[in-house]
Structure formats: C-alpha cells, structure tokens
Amino acid sequence: LRTNLFKLCLALCLTVGVHTALFAQTRPDFTGVWQLASPPMTSAQGYPELDLTPAGQRKVDAYRSLVDPVGDSPTLWCVTHGMPEIMMGGGGYPLEVIHKPDQVTLINEWQSETRRVFLGDRIESSESIFPSRQGYSTGHWEGEVLVVETRHLQEMVDSRFPHSADTVITERFSLTHDADGTPRLVADTVMHDPLWHEAPLSYRLEWTPSPLGWMQPYECMEERWLERLDELATQ
C-alpha cells in the first residue's frame, strides 16, 4: 500500500511539474535591446497630459521658483530620470531588458539607469525598502502579460511627471509581432497619485528591437569631471 501511495504521489508531482514547466514556456521572453517604436516623447510631440491638484501645484511652483531663474535642472547634475520618465525614451536612448525567472532588469543607456522587477520569492517586505526615484517594482503573470507594480517612490518635484510618495505605477508588459514578424514590446501604463494628480495618467509605450543590438557606455559624472579639469587648467 505504501509503495502504491508513493507511486501515486510521484506521478502527481511529475504531472504538476511538467504542467508548470509547459506553462512557463508559454510566457514571452522580453530579453533584448529595444528602442521606442515611435520617436522619443518630447514636449513638442506631446507628453500625456497631467492635471495637478492644488497641493501638487503648490509643490511644483515652489520648485520652479528655485530653478527657473538660474536655468538649473537635475540633468545638469547627472540626476537620473526616475519613474516613469526612465521608460519614455528621452534622448532616443535604447532600453536593455534582461529577463530571468525571478527578476526582470531594465537598463536605460542614459546614465545606465536601472530598474529591477522582482518576481515570486524575490519580493522584499515593505520595512526593508527605501523610497527612491525608481521605486520598488514587483511583478506577476496574468497569462502572457507581465503585470508590474511600482511603489515606494520618493516625492519628486523635478520630474516631467511630478508625483508624491503615495504614487503607484502599474505597467502591463506584453509581446506582439508586426505583420513582417518584427517583435514589439508593449507596456500599457497607469500612474495613480491620489495626492497630487486629479486623475490617473494612462498611456502606452511600444518598442522594437534596436538595430545596433547593444548599448554604449554612458557615464555622466565623468564628463562633468573632465569639464572641471579643463576649468582648472585655464585658471
């Protein structure tokens, strides 16, 4: 009897394991170097419209009063874009995606700004997470769609999309193909900030494979250091 029960349990485990493996194989692999299918978003082409609440507008106005008179910006100080702007292809820089079973890593060529999407057991407890410009991203699968939720974002007034620390960004990543077979990475995104935004911000981003197929190194601080050396040499 014990032998028969053992065989039955083994058969069930193997069946579940094979089913899990086959299901995992149906999930798309987003690995690759991608570029936006349309030109990078600019103010001329039209960013998604964002309506600020009075509280959000006061925060942004206070920030603008500091930087506008001197023409300063975080870019001049090599500050990374953060979410959600990192995904919008500013400057036309490509995006590299490294897809593993427990983590999806997204690297923007500009400043090598990096996001990590943790899956399954990789997810940390809230107590161990510090707010940041990129936030903390976790993901789960809904069929062939990877649903990514980003929380723990720090308050940002210096972004094209200013937001409070209560912001939650949800992205739904999927893989489609054009008529000629060209793969297309799609991210349907919703940004929700109950404190600073009058309504959720929704938009779609699409990428196709980068013709170059790899990314150039980018070191913002080194360039500023070389400029500083030139200044010292002329003094």
Where are these regions (language model features)?
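Bacterial N-terminal signal peptides
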Residues: 7-21
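N-terminal secretory signal peptides that target proteins for export/translocation
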Residues: 1-7
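Hydrophobic small-molecule pocket/channel-lining residues, especially in calycin-type beta-barrels
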Residues: 24-235
